[in-house]
Amino acid sequence: MSNDNTVSWQGPRRIVNLYDTPYEPYDLEGEVQDNIHLLNIGYDRDRATGWYVIRMEPGTASLPHEHAKHEEYLILEGELIESDGTVLKKGDFISYSPGSFHNSRTETGCLLIGHDRDPYAE
């Protein structure tokens, strides 16, 4: 069966597989953090906005940090434990406002996709 609405693809695109692409040491909070890995899938370091994937090894904790922008992420695998004790699991979506201060740790390991953005215009 054909679809008469199909058009041929035009323009650039980038496809990244989260499981096949090498990760880099995580450094979005300034210094490199051991056992935390970053995959830049659309993050603009100059503007500090865009998409990324973070993989945390079991037993790892992030450095305490404050969010300058909105940060949102979705847990894809494992669990993440927030500094207030909240346990985030696969499928949980989290949204932080600018000025939020926390750190996170994982006992199981964790894979998440995140997005940092400027506030929406009102």
Where are these regions (language model features)?
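Ligand-binding loop in jelly-roll beta-barrel domains
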Residues: 34, 98-122
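Conserved short histidine dyad/triad with adjacent acidic residue
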Residues: 37-67, 97-101
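Short acidic-glycine-tyrosine-enriched beta hairpin
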Residues: 82-102
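A short, N-terminal "cap"/entry segment at the start of jelly-roll beta-barrel domains
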Residues: 1-47
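Short glycine/proline-enriched turns and hinge-like loops at secondary-structure junctions
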Residues: 66-68, 86-87, 106-108
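Structural motif
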Residues: 49-53, 73, 110-111
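Glycine- and acidic-residue-biased ligand/ion/polar-headgroup-sensing regions
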Residues: 58, 67-83
